[in-house]
Amino acid sequence: MKGQTETIKLTLEVLTPLHVGSGEELRLNLDYIERGNIPLVVDRQRTLDALVSGDQALDEVLGGDWNLAELVKLAGQDFGYPLPMLSGRSETPATLREQIKDAEFRPYVPGSSLKGAIRTALLAEWLQCNPGYSFQALLPCPQRSRRDPSRTEPSKRAQFAAQDLLKDVFGANPNRDILRAMQVSDVRFQAADLRLADIRWLNIIHVKGQEKAAWRDMASRQNRDNWQDASGLYIETLAPDSAASFTLGWDRFLLSDLTKWGAPAHGAELLPADFSVLRKVLNNHARRIFENEVAFFDQYQATAPQKQLQKLLNRMQQDNESAYLRLAWGSGWRGMTGDWLDAPSLSTMRELYRLGRQNMPFPKTRRLAVQGTPCLPLGWVRLGPWREKVATVQRHPWVEQALTEIQQKNRCQADEALRGAQLADAWQVLRDPELKAAALADIQSRWREKGWWDQPPPGKSTKKALAIYRGDNA
């Protein structure tokens, strides 16, 4: 039995914009350029390799005050990836926060991030199901400051506030941690899954003795009534509906006898034995978050995000095979901690670590991605069974962006934009041969899925579009 790991293959589907940051900030004309009114994130190494391997003299390329756009032009090919806006607008900001990627510019969700979110949910649900477990004694308490004995300070720094509790629940050290028996792989996506998200801060303020929702301007730190008047920030995110596979494994040898490796005695009830049980635990935790967040937005008349969260809650309640989970940047204080503190303990921790303002709800801000209006909460994913898909052409970012712009400009449906001549006209003037070929492959795939390529729907615009794609008017 030693070394026996039971592994299942699952799908991680992104439900709302997901950002796992690299810690780096990308800058215009240093890391990306503007191409077709959207950012083109440049692979500088491949661009320089192309220049050096070509006819361009190395000293001419690297000497002086070089411009990234000029280097890309000299290379004769775009190395990197386009970054369409999630909201559909055409915009190239001065800076943006980078999504973590591998050496090939492919975004991924580290297994450690996914496992950390699972750990948080397991802790919260285990504490909910074991009200007799007294965790208060394991939390930090006030103590006299070493520097100033007249003042008090927490017995532990904020980043270690739950350390004793986590050791008591999961295990005294990494070798004895019950989650050592769970293995989670990285989840690897494609660059085409990335979108540029415009993030805004909804903030609760006091006005004439009453609480109300406003929008935090991140430049001036002032509050605005209209979100359009409040600046936010831009981040790379994995787009909703993007999906990739990963593996989840249970080490059956370790789980066969917890006492041999010093795991906690309650480990068997803490770590679900298979995905079907894990799914129920994660969904119980997700349901609490959904319900609390729906109530929060409803209280402050923030209808757009309230509807999005209610829609996700309804979807989860009708889904009998998947687990719903929130992770990574933007999940907020409650998402990071698991929101398991009772009211007295929360009040104590707020006072001890000076969390939030007195007489105000905590936390009082929410980060929302703009899609027409700030409405999308961040970080929600669905973990479900892996089903092999029939190979299809990858949806191309240029086609996605062009369709969105046509829909917004003409206020038309997606099918109308796809079959119309405006998309064909925009495609026809593309200068990059590789981009043009890839975009056409995507357009053809979409047309064939709807049966239009062989039996086009009636209309002059569709007839013209088909002629352009087939080269009949060349």
Give the positions of each predicted feature.
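Basic polyanion-binding and macromolecular-assembly surfaces
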Residues: M1-Q56, A172-D177, A181, V187-A474
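Aromatic- and Gly/Pro-rich amphipathic surface segment
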Residues: L30-T92
